[in-house]
């Protein structure tokens, strides 16, 4: 299977463009900020466009979908991920930096 790395990178950069920073003051409500639900709606639409089945989004911002098996012998797999980011991290916009040919050494995030 060939991976379209440019398409994957574009999708990743799209996801990080959403401000999904959590609100510590609003910790009894899920999602805690409107931006989290905006990303959830976007993910739901994208999963539908990709042809997944049983795509749903609930009032708490949980996005679920089913990708049917393409073979009779495959194991069932589940992927779970947060869409929110820490209130201590910048909320956005986030600028990505792509490191090509990573050599395994430390990556300096800020030269200051």
Give the positions of each predicted feature.
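Metal-centered catalytic cores of metalloenzymes
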Residues: 28-40, 55
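General structural feature for long, well-ordered alpha-helical segments within catalytic domains
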Residues: 4-12, 35, 39-43, 75
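Short, well-structured beta-strand/strand-turn elements
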Residues: 53-61
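Short beta-strand-to-loop junctions in surface cap/lid or active-site-entrance loops
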Residues: 65-73
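N-terminal capping segment at the start of a domain
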Residues: 5-33
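Active-site metal-coordination/substrate-binding segment of hydrolases
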Residues: 73-112
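A structural signal for the main folded, soluble domain(s) of proteins
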Residues: 24, 54, 88-91
């Amino acid at each position: 299977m060939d991976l379209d790395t440019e398409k994957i990178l574009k999708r990743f950069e799209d996801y990080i463009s959403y401000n999904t920073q959590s609100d510590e003051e609003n910790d009894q409500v899920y999602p805690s900020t409107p931006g989290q639900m905006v990303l959830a709606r976007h993910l739901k639409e994208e999963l539908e466009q990709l042809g997944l089945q049983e795509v749903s989004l609930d009032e708490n911002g949980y996005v679920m979908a089913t990708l049917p098996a393409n073979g009779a012998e495959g194991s069932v797999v589940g992927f779970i991920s947060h869409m929110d980011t820490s209130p201590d991290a910048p909320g956005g916009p986030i600028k990505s930096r792509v490191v090509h040919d990573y050599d395994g050494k430390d990556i300096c995030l800020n030269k200051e």
